Amino acid sequence: NSQTILVTPPGFSAYQNYIQQAQQSPYWKNALYDGFSLPAQGQAKEYCKKWISYGCDNVKQHPNKQHYAEHTLKSCKVAFCPKCFESWIGRQANRTTRRLSKFLESREIRKHYKFRHIILSPPNADKMSYKKLKRNLDFTLKVANIKTCAIVFHPFRFNKDKSIPVRSPHFHLLVYGHVTNTTEFYNKTKWTIKNKGDLKTDKDIFSCVRYLLSHCGVRKGTHAVRYLGDISYRKLKVEKEGHIP
């Protein structure tokens, strides 16, 4: 049977395009790699995206003797949820931005370094397990002299309109510091590095991470964003953000 593919409206950003396809492309549902799937391909809970109202009619204790009511849009904030995955993306992108921003504040005396978005692609990766890929990545990072970075795993690449995922595992990194990209690096690893440019502001970091999470690999028990080096959980403590309904 033929499948209906939605055409992307003019003016859509790449992020909006991925969000639309996550919700509506029939091909995303069947994209699987070593336990990883794509965002929004699970089941929503009964309360997801429903308005919940709380109230108190103890008017004697209220200013101006008025009733009190509060309305909240409920969200499970889970990557697999077709209704709430954007809430998960926003919260995770905000957490990553705050972590990287706090690290940069502590490095104020070295302003010439910003986080840089790079893509690391291994050879013949479609037949490797994630465990083996991760082990090879660790070696590759050492050869490239990458110590401090945030890592987002992408099991798939996509066709032009982002509707059809094709298995092609690779890693997106937000890297701090100098990256060694030489002939020697390629000869030792056979991995390729693609430099996507510096992230100059917090907004750049947030937009980049949000975009990456819109079509990343998600798997229960595995962090969608991994932090290494000086931004790791062990080395950098960041206060939790306030409550988001």
Predicted feature locations:
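Conserved, short, structured surface segments that act as functional micro-motifs
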Residues: 170
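Right-hand nucleic-acid polymerase module
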Residues: 1-167, 177-245
